[in-house]
Structures are given as structure tokens and as C-alpha cells.
């Protein structure tokens, strides 16, 4: 948060003082360029190691600030008028809001060429189409995890909905995935971009299908899922994963590709979620995806070069080389990326689904929605999980529809600004 900026400022000040003592050294050396991002632990270490190598020959120093409270940190820095040069966010809704408020700088070439749907759709601003962010890494959703040898004809679902301030998002992933496979990319895209009512039959059906798939839970089981992290319980070596967590009598887990890090070395199986969701056959090759996108918040022209280097084939190669296999990043396109050492079976399966099997990729719907609506969606999922009665669902969807309409009215400046609508696309954009 602001403390991070203070510490960085002190480091820069001390470095400047030392330089001033050396004859011939300039006392006005440029500040480091700061990247604010969501990765901590081993992910953060790998990204920071790659970043430190990418500034070679630039005359600038790149530094990384990683936090799990990314939104709160960025909001605090913007309020203090001390934004990072570059921030990496996973929410198109938040990025869209920052662009609307004039906080982002349009991307320069050649970075703009690496930004394509569904990860980085263009925005209409002041009558011009502009690109404000580029995907650095992506995650494939629409996946189901289980132990090898476990029958899949009658799965018992592991559910952990807790995630600190964003609790509920694992449930929104379920509903989004079900709607995508039942209704198809068209209705999904309209719903994600606030052009479809929350009372629409396709939306209602997705919620009720989720309740049916998870039916038969005891009050104790419901409370356990509401209070347990999506990473599962914690052991001496860290999160165990829901499939390995004591007290969870379950066989299958619906979760994004990133969860592979908690199952590293386990006898694990991953497969597409389509056949579990009571969807249509024609939608089986549609997949939900997420991403971490870089945007420029600074007028410093070197910040544009920083993002260009991060999103380049060389930047990807360096990042991938620094990462442990369990947290090795996935990229939105492999063109220009030199081959690396063979991946394990799970990575090979995920890579094949993302780059070969998938015909349509749709960005995570809640991450496209405006933050107010997304947060309300999270809360509604938690309430519905506790009480899935039809009458309760109708009340929750009415509340979400009211928020959708209100947010649209509050941001009714379509003549000068239009949020993205193309959040489903083929693998190549």
C-alpha cells in the first residue's frame, strides 16, 4: 500500500545520496520504474527475477511490488497521486473504469499488436478505438480436477468459497461456466457486458443447475465450504488443495488451471468441465479464461517500453525460465515463443486445451463486470449457497438486476466512452 511507496522512496533517496558522494556521478538519476502486481510467493519471485533481467540496456531499473490486496493498494496509490508506472490487473471491469476516468495511457506499438480479444478488447474513447492493456499471462478455466482412477460418472464436488475480501468468486466461476455451456457464447457475452437481464431464463437456469449439481449437502457441509479457502486447508507445506483436505468427502473440483500449484507432484487428472455441466454439445469446445493484464498509469515514455518488453517473446521466455514448473505461466499466444523443456502431463493437457481444443474463449464474466456489480455477484453467490430456495434466488437476481441498471445509468456516457463488448473470441483473437 502507501507504505510500499514510502519504502521505495527511501531506497531511491539513499541511492541518490550515495551517488552524490561519488565524483562524476549524477545526483538526478531517474527513479526506478515500478510494476504493481498480484503475484506473491514463488510466482512473485519468478516474475521479479525476470523483471530484473529485462531492464538490461535501458538505462532504467525495473522493480516489482506484489500484493494480494491489489485493488486496495492501487486505489490508495491513485488517491495519493503516487500511482505505479505499470499495474497488472485481472479485471477488465476495473481496467475499463480506470480508462474511463483517464488514469490509463493508450498502448504504443508494437505492444498494441499483442493485445487481442478476449483478453484485451479495444475501447471506444472520444470517438476513437484505443487499446489500454495487454495480457501478460492467462489462465484456462472450465476445468475439473480429480485424482487419477476416480470414477467421474457420479462426482461429489469439493467446494471452498472463502477468499478474504473476494470470497464467493469460486461460485461465480461455476455459474459463468454453466451459462456458457448451456446458453452459448452469444448470451454469455451479452450477460457479461450488462446487455442481458439477470432475470433472463438462461441466467436463472445457470443458478438452478449449480444448486442441483451440489444438492444434498448438510448444514455442516455448507458452512465448511463457506469458511474454507478455495486452496483447501493448510498443512506444514502450505495449502493442500480441496481434494487433499481433511474433512472434505469429495472426488472432483471445479477450478482454474492456476490451482495446479497445490497439486504439484500429485497423481492428479484434469479434464474439460463441459460434460459435467448439462450443457449443449455445440458448446463443448467453449472455454472460460482469465488473465493478468498490464496497463500503463504513468506518462513516463519508458513505462511503454517496459510493457513492450514484458509482453515480448523474450520477456515470456525469461519469465518462464525463472518459474518453477508448478507456477510456470501460460501465455495467450505461443507465436514467437521458443520451445521449452517438456511440461508434465497436467501442463501438456492444459496447453493442448488452450491452444488446440478450444474453439471459443470467453473472458471470466464477473471480471468483465463493473466492480460494484462484480462484488454484488460475489455476495449473492454466498447467500445462494447457504439458501438455494427458488424464492430466495428470485430476490437475489432482482437485486443484481437493480444494480446492473443503476451502474449503466451512472456511466451513461456512450457517446464519448463505450466499454468492451467482444469478450469471446477464437484462440488467436
Task: Report each predicted region and the residues it spans.
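Extracytoplasmic/periplasmic solute-binding protein
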Residues: 134-135, 152-202
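Extracytoplasmic/periplasmic substrate-recognition and gating elements
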Residues: 264-330
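Glycine-centered hinge/linker elements that transmit conformational signals in sensory
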Residues: 192-234
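C-terminal motif of bacterial Sec signal peptides marking the signal peptidase cleavage site
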Residues: 21-24
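Bacterial signal peptide processing site
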Residues: 26-28
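Early extracytoplasmic/lumenal segment of secretory-pathway proteins
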Residues: 31-96, 100, 110-113, 117, ...
Amino acid at each position: 500500500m502507501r507504505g510500499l511507496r514510502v519504502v521505495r522512496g527511501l531506497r531511491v533517496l539513499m541511492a541518490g545520496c550515495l551517488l552524490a558522494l561519488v565524483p562524476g556521478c549524477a545526483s538526478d538519476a531517474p527513479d526506478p520504474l515500478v510494476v504493481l502486481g498480484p503475484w506473491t510467493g514463488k510466482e512473485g519471485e519468478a516474475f521479479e527475477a525476470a523483471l530484473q533481467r529485462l531492464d538490461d540496456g535501458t538505462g532504467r531499473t525495473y522493480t516489482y511490488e506484489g500484493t494480494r490486496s491489489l485493488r486496495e493498494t492501487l486505489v490508495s496509490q491513485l488517491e495519493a497521486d503516487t500511482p505505479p508506472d505499470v499495474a497488472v490487473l485481472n479485471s477488465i471491469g476495473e481496467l475499463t473504469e480506470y480508462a474511463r476516468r483517464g488514469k490509463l495511457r493508450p498502448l504504443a506499438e508494437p505492444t498494441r499488436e499483442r493485445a487481442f480479444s478476449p483478453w484485451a478488447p479495444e475501447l471506444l474513447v472520444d470517438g476513437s478505438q484505443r487499446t489500454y492493456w495487454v495480457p501478460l499471462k492467462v489462465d484456462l478455466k472450465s476445468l475439473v480436477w480429480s485424482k487419477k482412477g476416480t470414477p467421474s460418472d457420479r462426482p461429489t464436488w469439493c467446494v471452498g468459497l472463502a477468499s478474504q475480501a473476494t470470497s464467493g468468486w469460486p461460485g461465480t466461476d461455476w455459474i459463468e461456466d454453466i451459462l456458457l455451456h448451456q446458453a452459448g457464447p452469444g448470451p454469455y457475452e451479452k450477460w457479461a457486458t450488462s446487455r442481458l437481464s439477470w432475470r433472463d431464463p438462461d441466467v436463472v437456469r445457470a443458478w438452478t443447475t449449480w444448486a442441483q449439481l451440489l444438492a444434498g449437502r448438510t448444514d455442516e457441509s455448507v458452512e465448511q465450504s463457506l469458511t474454507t479457502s478455495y486452496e483447501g486447508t493448510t498443512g506444514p507445506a502450505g495449502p493442500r488443495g480441496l481434494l487433499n483436505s481433511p474433512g472434505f468427502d469429495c472426488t472432483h473440483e471445479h477450478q482454474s488451471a492456476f490451482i495446479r500449484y497445490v497439486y504439484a507432484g500429485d497423481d492428479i487428472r484434469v479434464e474439460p468441465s463441459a460434460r459435467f455441466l448439462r450443457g449443449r454439445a455445440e458448446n463443448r469446445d467453449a472455454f472460460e479464461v482469465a488473465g493478468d493484464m498490464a496497463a500503463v498509469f504513468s506518462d513516463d515514455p519508458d513505462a511503454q517500453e517496459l510493457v513492450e518488453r514484458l509482453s515480448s517473446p523474450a520477456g515470456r521466455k525469461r519469465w518462464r525460465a525463472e518459474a518453477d514448473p508448478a507456477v510456470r505461466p501460460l501465455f495467450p499466444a505461443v507465436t514467437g515463443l521458443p520451445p521449452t523443456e517438456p511440461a508434465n502431463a497436467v501442463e501438456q493437457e492444459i496447453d493442448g486445451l488452450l491452444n488446440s481444443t478450444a474453439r471459443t474463449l470467453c473472458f471470466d464474466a464477473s471480471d468483465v463486470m463493473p466492480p460494484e456489480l462484480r462484488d454484488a455477484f460475489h455476495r449473492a453467490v454466498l447467500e445462494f449457497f447457504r439458501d438455494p430456495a427458488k424464492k430466495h434466488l428470485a430476490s437475489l437476481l432482482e437485486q443484481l438486476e437493480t444494480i446492473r441498471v443503476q451502474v449503466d445509468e451512472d456511466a451513461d456516457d456512450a457517446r464519448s466512452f463505450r466499454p468492451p463488448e467482444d469478450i469471446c473470441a477464437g484462440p488467436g483473437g
